[in-house]
């Protein structure tokens, strides 16, 4: 059995996608791409929910938008039952509740 077999997820999982892009044009392109597929949490930090196939497609398309020699794109899986909390200023106005990620993949 391949070593990466245990890393494959078939169910929906949460991932943090973050980047450091050196060129403003590439930065804008990547931001516009990710904003349609994930939820922005902070500048250059997004929450992506999907299975392995969706994540791979998202990242492969994102790689096409960056310069791999100058830019940095990272993906971190979040544990399914891990603590997810926000401390500090609220992201949304009071009374507004977040119901999920964008429907369009």
From Swiss-Prot:
GO biological process: defense response to virus; maintenance of CRISPR repeat elements
Keyword Metal-binding tagged: yes
Superkingdom of origin organism: Bacteria
Family statement: Belongs to the CRISPR-associated endoribonuclease Cas2 protein family.
Gene Ontology molecular functions: metal ion binding; RNA endonuclease activity
Alphabetical list of Pfam families matching this protein: CRISPR_Cas2 (PF09827)
Function noted in UniProt: CRISPR (clustered regularly interspaced short palindromic repeat), is an adaptive immune system that provides protection against mobile genetic elements (viruses, transposable elements and conjugative plasmids). CRISPR clusters contain sequences complementary to antecedent mobile elements and target invading nucleic acids. CRISPR clusters are transcribed and processed into CRISPR RNA (crRNA). Functions as a ssRNA-specific endoribonuclease. Involved in the integration of spacer DNA into the CRISPR cassette.
Subunit structure: Homodimer, forms a heterotetramer with a Cas1 homodimer.
Keywords, ordered alphabetically: Antiviral defense, Endonuclease, Hydrolase, Magnesium, Metal-binding, Nuclease
Cofactors, names only: Mg(2+)
Name of the protein described by the UniProt record: CRISPR-associated endoribonuclease Cas2 1
E.C. number(s) listed in UniProt: 3.1.-.-
Enzyme class, broadest EC rank: hydrolase
Positions that bind Mg(2+): 20
InterPro entries from the UniProt entry: CRISPR_associated_Cas2, Virulence_VapD/CRISPR_Cas2
């Amino acid at each position: 059995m391949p070593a990466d077999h245990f890393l494959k997820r078939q169910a929906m999982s949460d991932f943090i996608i973050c980047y450091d892009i050196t060129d403003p044009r590439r930065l804008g392109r990547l931001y516009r791409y990710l904003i349609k597929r994930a939820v922005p949490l902070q500048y250059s930090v997004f929450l992506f929910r999907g299975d392995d196939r969706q994540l791979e497609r998202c990242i492969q398309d994102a790689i096409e938008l960056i310069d791999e020699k100058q830019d940095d794109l990272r993906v971190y899986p979040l544990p399914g039952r891990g603590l997810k909390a926000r401390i500090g200023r609220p992201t949304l106005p009071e009374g507004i509740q977040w119901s999920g990620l964008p429907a369009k993949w």
